[in-house]
């Protein structure tokens, strides 16, 4: 992981005009991405992830604020930025009539590579992404996972310093998603900085060295996955009772081992110290008041707990 910042933004904003008035899709985003990291932008659909990514990739001008990529200002030196980056949109961008090899060679030629060099580079990418056997087949015959890997390869033809990936595993089955994670880790191992957007909690947790959680165009938390989860103290205990949930919260919130107690979608959610030791005490207290839990689950804090703590909403339900 690097220490120098290859991406920096300061108070980045983007406003769109709408019938109901101006909509600020990106509302003062300030962040830094270290060279060689996998950086994740985690948030629900409509949070401002893709808009921010498009600004950094010079596809959309910011309304205000500053952003630099590889030392170049995205607004004032976009051509220099584009030579340092690869960009893979969620929808991809490959031509369905061409073969995988042809698409890679075409991309290399667009970056002024000689034909022979582009052909060599195409073969390197096909081998690295395990697409060599399908290299001369039309892309229309590729599976979703193969097309996604090819699109990443297209973004890597010119060996960019930074690769932007917009929701790289959306729509993939679990096996294809796990394989894509391995490919992204390989990019980091080769020295490429990866900036990806995702609404998958497990993806952000498994892949990212650092991440920022964004909601309504604003960053609400940032750090490594473990640092963020440590912000949610103790264990998370969720209790389902038949009615009287507010009474249960009042009974439990003042216990010495309960850090926080609240209601979420009809369930009592507690943040407790040493949850396995707390459960017997809680059960005895509820039983003494004639209350019998219908369900009870205990888990370590997750990134969803971080999102819930910062926004009052569950990212799993928001993204569903």
Protein language model regions, located:
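Preference for bulky hydrophobic residues occupying beta-strand positions
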Residues: 14, 31, 239-241, 270, ...
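ABC transporter nucleotide-binding domain
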Residues: 181-273
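ABC transporter nucleotide-binding domains
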Residues: 4-9, 14-221
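C-terminal coupling/interaction segments
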Residues: 274-320
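Conserved protein kinase catalytic domain
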Residues: 82, 126, 229, 249, ...
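Residues at or immediately flanking beta-strands
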Residues: 66, 138, 236, 260-262, ...
